[in-house]
């Protein structure tokens, strides 16, 4: 196997110590660098020109991808307004060497893989808890649960060091189907009114029930794949109203970008007793 093939099997980037262990002498590595087939990154990393930019930048920074940058790479949900900076987990002795980086210097939560360019899932989630508001951080955590081979129980057993991470761990669930549902759930919690999630009523599940009779439906990002879906939802809402429920349906845009209006409507409904069973004389 030649050096280029070896690198291609490692996502295009590798540490020179690993290359040496694989039988590639410093002379062969330097020759590959001279011909332009391999790039040198700092003193100890080498990469193909086609290697992922974020990995090359992490190597150049002397750290590992973390927080929202690892979330993007591993295809977790990312808040639409998240910054474009590269978030890197750096050892305590490293400093930022280029612009466009966001450094996280916290001590790793557990042992780290030698020369890894990706922080552990736990460290990345801890950093996300520090970088984002509770609702968005919780959505990132729950997306990681859906994407990675981790469980809610395992996350809740981690000895989180920051108050922010412990708070997110308390709010994280494993039964939400989307990040939009997660954000809605976090924002609706803590009002001092009973909140239930994914309740089966009148033949179909509803997203949230506040109290006993106030229903909140959240239409997702890809709302309605067909007119039949829309017709079914309208019919279900009508049946719920006939049974005495108050039903509000909000779009993803309202939840994400106009939450104060959503909150105002729901608080007004609660103040009028819409969350309580209707009085029947």
Residue ranges and their predicted role:
Residues 144-281:
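Surface segments flanking catalytic/ligand-binding clefts of nucleic-acid enzymes
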Residues 1-162, 168, 271-281:
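Short gly/ser-rich loop at a beta-strand->alpha-helix junction or flexible surface loop bordering the NTP-binding
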